[in-house]
Each structure stands twice: as structure tokens, then as C-alpha cells.
Amino acid sequence: MNKKRKPLELYVHIPFCIRKCAYCDFVSGPGTKAMQKEYEEALLAEIDAAEETAESEVISVFFGGGTPSAVDAGMLARVMEKLRSKYIFSEDAEITLEANPGTLDAEKLKCYRKSGFNRISIGCQSVHDEELKRLGRIHTFAEFQESFALARDAGLNVV
């Protein structure tokens, strides 16, 4: 962190998920590919329109939702690329992605890492499959464990 710059933290809302969980109060829900593309275009335009902040330095970016891992990994990569073109990032900026174990695979995780994500929050919610069903989750505890291992293998060391 450059001592002369003010720390800046960014939140990027990705409102899409596979299906809305019974307990979720966030603005989110399933969306078509066309809706996701339209949202991406609006998000990129919003970043373009944001004020230049040469006196600030990004120390963290958090992608929440919804379930950011439910959308195409390329979309998140393009958003990160746009953010990096607009803002100054600290060398050790924390870039976090919220994820559902039922939406992760090795290819997506490698794309996230390549795009600069260095932290992932994988929502397990419970280690009991029956509870996961009651909560409306789309994964099992075994799928969470597999996703955790895949995230580590992809180089995401903060899981």
C-alpha cells in the first residue's frame, strides 16, 4: 500500500444464482444468459463512468451476490480486467469471490486465479446433506469438500 494514497475497497454485486435459497434476503435469482450478458455490459459501462481515483489504491475487491460462481468465469475475468484498467491496485490487494460448491469446477477455478482472484468464500452452510436439502442448497457436503480441494489445487490459498 502506497502511504500517500487512500485505501479503496470495492464491492461488485453479481445478482445471479442457480436458484434462490429459502433463507436468502439478497437481490438475486436465476437469470438467462441474455440477462447475464446485459448485466455485464451495464457493469462494464458503470466502471467506465466511475470517477478517476489517482489518489486512491484498491486494497480489496469483493464479488458477492447472488452467486458470482454461477455466471461464466469469463464475465468475472472481464470485470476484473476493466477494474484493473480503471484503478490502481495495491500489490497485495485481496480479490474475493463468493461461490457455491455446486457451481465450481477445475477450469473455472483456474480462470479465477488467472484473473487475479486470490481468495474464495465457498458457502458450505452445513456438513449434513439433509440440512442442505432443507435449505434449498444445490450441493452436498462431499461436493463442498471436492470444491475446496479444487480451489487449493488452482492456487487459491485463502479458502
What are these regions (language model features)?
Residues M1-Y11, F26, A54-E55:
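N-terminal [4Fe-4S]-dependent radical SAM core
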Residues M1-K3, R19, F63, S85:
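Generic cytosolic/nucleocytoplasmic N-terminal low-complexity/intrinsically disordered segments
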Residues K4, P15, L150-R152:
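Short glycine/proline-enriched loop/turn "hinge" motifs that connect secondary-structure elements
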Residues P7-E9, C21, E94:
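Structural motif
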Residues P15-S28:
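Local cysteine-cluster metal-coordination motifs and their immediate loop/turn environment
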Residues S28-A54, V58-V159:
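Conserved non-cysteine loop/helix-boundary elements of the Radical SAM core domain that shape
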Residues V12-I14, C124:
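Alpha/beta-hydrolase
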